Design a protein with these regions (language model features):
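ABC ATPase nucleotide-binding domains
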Residues: 2, 6, 10, 14-17, ...
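The feature captures the beta-strand-to-loop junction immediately N-terminal to the Walker
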Residues: 85-87
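Helix-to-loop junction immediately C-terminal to a conserved catalytic motif
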Residues: 100
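Conserved ABC transporter NBD signature motif
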Residues: 108-116, 125
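Conserved ABC ATPase "signature" region
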Residues: 161-179
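H-loop/switch region of ABC-family ATPase nucleotide-binding domains
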Residues: 243-244
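Conserved ABC ATPase "signature" C-loop
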Residues: 261-262
Length: 348
């Protein structure tokens, strides 16, 4: 990798830190700069490891000998937050269960930082790959929230003091601070879901797998999960989520993978993937609602999120008002900070 590319990667990593919510920024900076941390050079090295030697190679899997579920699957893994979407039966859950070691491939390999992990047990992968079940009741078994969150880190050999720090951080990140002594089954479903997420966050794994994290979550819960994804990404972790919520996918994931019948139909950014009409039709998926709206209104540009749409359209309104109030020419308009986008003039 050239020095220029290294600088670009570093700039992108630090931009994530800068854009993080205030209450998480200091923790992320400490993680990147503080004593005992990897530092920026170490983070870059970890990123290069992800890019070069993590993924699935020629993977085959079936539950029954004559009914293949995944066939000749090849996929590279990197640090980008990744959403896996597709209809039920597409092979999404089977794929992430293979990554966690719940099931073993019939053939092929799974590599993690250059090491073949396809033969490792769930216990052996506990410290590196975290998994949050769709139903938190399949995961929770302790009598209070703190004991539940501490169970994982203590059982993978984490120092007790460090485990308490990680647990406190996980509870703060999930909005559960102050509920440490509550019985998880006295909490609402969305809070139990956050408890399950916190219990895996505290283990500080390199990979976090989330199975339908937005189910039973209101707007606030969705915002918290989005913050968790950004925070982990800023710490150099990989978040993989199985989702049916296309709007949440568009808002929070840099990489989107569409699966159908055990095959990958599309793999790219959200904008790239949701622009593939035939692939979406084949996978029986819909575009995010905002994208559908912008296309129905005839906009030349497709918008993925409400924020993107409002920012652009408000800039358009400002430009139109400015032009109506004066006899400004197009050239002078450009000089005042506007640029032309299609047939519209948008403020920078």
């Amino acid at each position: 990798m050239s020095m220029r590319m290294r600088k670009q990667v570093c700039k992108k990593q630090w931009e994530r830190v800068r854009q993080a919510p205030d209450r998480y920024r200091q923790r992320m900076l400490k993680q990147a700069q503080g004593p005992g941390s990897l530092g920026l050079a170490g983070r870059l090295k970890t990123l290069l490891l992800w890019m070069s030697s993590s993924g699935l190679k020629k993977l085959d899997f079936s539950y029954l000998a004559d009914i293949p579920v995944l066939e000749d699957l090849n996929m590279k893994l990197d640090q980008r937050p990744t959403a896996i979407i597709g209809q039920n039966g597409a092979g999404k859950t089977t794929l992430v269960k293979l990554l966690k070691g719940f099931v073993k491939p019939v053939s092929g390999s799974i590599y993690f930082h250059g090491e073949d992990i396809s033969g490792k047990t769930v216990a052996m992968l506990a410290g590196s790959v975290g998994y949050v079940f769709q139903n938190p009741d399949d995961q929770i078994f302790k009598y209070n929230v703190m004991d539940e969150v501490l169970f994982g880190p203590l059982n993978i050999g984490m120092d007790p003091e460090q485990a308490k720090k990680e647990a406190a951080w996980a509870l703060e990140l999930t909005g559960l601070s102050g509920k440490e002594k509550e019985n998880p089954y006295d909490l609402e479903l969305y809070e139990r879901k956050m408890t399950a997420i916190a219990s895996v966050l505290a283990m500080d794994t390199d990979v976090l797998i989330l199975d339908e994290p937005t189910i039973a979550q209101d707007w606030k819960g969705r915002q918290i999960i989005g913050s968790i994804i950004r925070s982990l990404s800023g710490r150099g972790k990989l978040v993989i989520a199985i989702l049916h919520d296309m709007d949440f996918v568009a808002e929070n994931f840099e990489r989107v993978i569409i699966m159908a019948h055990g095959q990958v139909l599309a793999d790219g950014t959200a904008k790239e993937v949701f622009a593939q009409e035939e692939v979406l039709k084949k996978a029986r998926l819909q575009k995010p609602y905002v994208m559908q709206l912008s296309e129905a209104l005839g906009y030349e540009k497709s918008y993925l999120t409400v924020e993107e749409l409002l920012k652009d359209r408000m800039s358009l309104c400002a430009a139109i008002k400015l032009l109506k109030k004066s006899s400004i020419t197009k050239n002078s308009c450009l000089k005042q900070g506007f640029f032309v986008f299609g047939h519209r003039k948008i403020s920078e």
